[in-house]
């Protein structure tokens, strides 16, 4: 796994790879998550090597020095919070393996972060976005089916692009999703999503594959699994074409799915199951989005707002 902090002069401590191998084999984390851990740990390792130390010799004071250096360089609080999370897990691993006697990061507090409300789209904006791709073009027909499926299910983009044909049952109106840590969940499909996916499967998918065999539900024009970055760029393209000014992220449709369900009275625990959240508190942030939207509508449209 390549990393921008590595160079011919810098050699990461082998314990970093041991830690990442353990995460990969025992935790089932995604390549993106493992890459983030590697980036954080290699940046830190590079710093401690520059002051003549090794990861197993790190002191609490040295970690604080590194955090001060990051602060002076203008790193965001969110970036430092992620770094602290990576270091806690790494040094927890070293402690478990008895490679260190004490955890140097145990008493260091992570930077406090204001909980950011996720960006979402209004129902009208979702309609504009979903209607933008042209169904006569095979690529846009695929994209339209993907967008409908995304909004109908609240999948993560990574989960969407990795779907296979066997995970989909249009007859039952269900999709079997493999989420974080390999956890599976069944998510129902709405009628509109079923219709769009059926239309796509009747012609556009075969045009994209051009005779190639593949079990990928939504292949790229080369017949391979699409990357999440590619699909993200496609979403932005349609948003621009539709004239949607709302800031978009790869999770915008997932946020819209959750927020709109809650706005229409869905139970929070049902939304938690559909999203694949292991902790209800993760889902609860969407209740704030829903309330914020209702407050905005009240102030805009109520005669005494």
What spans do the regions from the language model cover?
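Conserved catalytic core of the tyrosine transesterase superfamily
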Residues: 1-305
